[in-house]
Amino acid sequence: VQTYKNLLYLALAFPLGLVYFVGLVFGAALGVGLLITWIGLPILLMTLFAVTVVAGFEAALARYLGGVNASVPTFLAEFDISGGLVFPGNGFVDAIKRLVTARTTWTSVVLVLAKFGFGLLSFVALAVSGSVTGAFLAAPFIYDDPDVVLGISGMVVDGDYTVGPWVVDTFPEALVASVVGVVFLFVALNLLNSLARFHARYTANLLQVDDEGL
């Protein structure tokens, strides 16, 4: 069951990472660009708060899909909408101070930015392992299809010698290829599980609740 959760965790990484990256860059660029007006700073603060919410969501994914105990950012754990964060008033300044001084607020920014790179890596790993494994496992069913070529094309060595090509075109070769596919599937699943565990633990380490602010 955990393997399926890890695969789902990896599959979600790229689309989520892309959305996070675009949202953070847009919010930061808009806020910095409008700093000369009164609206720029609130946009930056809202972006920073949104990043902590995203990090809290990532902590939940790490717990429920990655199987790692990850804490939400400090500010999010202490957040109380009645404390005056949404509208200036009692506790508003203190809430802003807690937001910008909590270490996990800024590690949340690191996490959100790193998610895009991890998502890209996860996408490549899933695509390559899935396509290669699928091709080998399907060999006994497609080896004699004239529209399908299963094998490795020839490679030129030192400009004079050609190695290959190696093509699966007989049933015994197809059976061997399917066995290779089973072995590759086992190896790929272990590597993908390790990749998912690494990211879940990385998330948990970044979001460790700090006892004091910056």
What are the residue ranges of the model-derived segments?
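Acidic, polar-rich N-terminal leader regions of halophilic archaeal proteins
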Residues: 1-214
